[in-house]
């Protein structure tokens, strides 16, 4: 699938002033904090008339200020709202949200305000009578170890402090340190037990939810250079009243690196909707949100600075089903690695179905990556999810 130039003109919201003045010169921390909250198991399970998508833009801006990031632009489909942020992305569905923020953002500081807003504006009551904590259907919070932990806000400098803070809000949370337990090579996960008492609704059909994430460090210099803006790409002035160079250059970076061609689909599925929103930062850096079939997304974020280059990819696309068996997440991974050629990378794959085609294919990935050696390979059974984690390094 590929994007077209019309994707530059169909935003539901865009902050041209922020886009024109945003400067990434002092940015340094690529690895993101990833927060995913399922308030209900499905949109058909929601017990009131309003959903998360009824929350206004001004309220999301208020929430994101607590995180220390801003909204660059937003696109809506029938199923989700995709926000491109000054520091990564936010995806809002009717019943759940995924917030991914890099740099020195304070992701966890939005929790109190977020639950206040859903209670006041949506009449969603998740506070328990005992202890005053919240009990949504499911919560995930994860991040790899930071490149510069001492530069984070105090709450995010230490994983144990983050877990303590999360435990003030949620019951039944469990913490995992996945991979080699050193300062630079592990991945952290916090997940709550599924609240099976949450009403599912008469029409509820369980979704075989899956999420694939690839976190890459030490990118090939030539590959990283494709995400650097030249001196002619000054954003001091807008091209036209409804355009800005950051989004224009983001579109060009997407096309030049073929990041819009990660997923293929069969001939009869060629009419699947595909939306794109990307931004190129000055002097360097790239963020993009892609929406497939109205309800699936994949997002990429790149900090190409020499010495701490980093790129991430995350997707909830059920690739085997969407492609009708023509592609799986191993194919997706190989495409991504070809774009960035990292010296090291880790990947995580969550699925509810252990027999998932991509899950089984990724388990035997070694033979498909002859240029890499395995550092870690771990499988977890997490309540109603299976997690596969693997870390690899290029052969010297």
Curated annotation (Swiss-Prot):
Q: Name one GO molecular function term.
A: adenosylmethionine decarboxylase activity
Q: Which Pfam families match?
A: SAM_decarbox
Q: How is the cofactor bound?
A: Binds 1 pyruvoyl group covalently per subunit.
- Active site annotated at which positions? 29, 32, 88 (schiff-base intermediate with substrate), 102 (proton donor), 287 (proton acceptor), 301 (proton acceptor)
Its biological function? Answer: Catalyzes the decarboxylation of S-adenosylmethionine, a key step in the biosynthetic pathway for spermidine and spermine. It is essential for normal growth, sporulation, and maintenance of ds-RNA virus.
**E.C. numbers:** 4.1.1.50
Q: Please give the InterPro entries that the UniProt record associates with this protein.
A: AdoMetDC-like, S-AdoMet_decarboxylase_euk, S-AdoMet_deCO2ase_core, S-AdoMet_deCO2ase_CS
Instruction: Point out the annotated site residues (description: Cleavage (non-hydrolytic)).
Output: 87-88
Could you say which protein family the record assigns here? Belongs to the eukaryotic AdoMetDC family.
Q: At what positions is Pyruvic acid (Ser) found?
A: 88
Task: Output the Gene Ontology cellular-component terms.
Answer: cytoplasm; cytosol; nucleus
Q: How is it modified after translation?
A: Is synthesized initially as an inactive proenzyme. Formation of the active enzyme involves a self-maturation process in which the active site pyruvoyl group is generated from an internal serine residue via an autocatalytic post-translational modification. Two non-identical subunits are generated from the proenzyme in this reaction, and the pyruvate is formed at the N-terminus of the alpha chain, which is derived from the carboxyl end of the proenzyme.
Cofactor(s) recorded for this entry are: pyruvate
GO term, biological process aspect, one: spermidine biosynthetic process
Pathway the protein contributes to = Amine and polyamine biosynthesis; S-adenosylmethioninamine biosynthesis; S-adenosylmethioninamine from S-adenosyl-L-methionine: step 1/1
Q: Which SUPFAM superfamilies match?
A: S-adenosylmethionine decarboxylase
Name-wise, this protein is: S-adenosylmethionine decarboxylase proenzyme
Name the enzyme's class.
lyase
Q: Which reaction does it catalyse?
A: S-adenosyl-L-methionine + H(+) = S-adenosyl 3-(methylsulfanyl)propylamine + CO2
- Any miscellaneous information on file? Present with 7060 molecules/cell in log phase SD medium.
Q: Which UniProt keywords apply?
A: Autocatalytic cleavage, Decarboxylase, Lyase, Polyamine biosynthesis, Pyruvate, S-adenosyl-L-methionine, Schiff base, Spermidine biosynthesis, Zymogen
Gene that produces this protein: SPE2
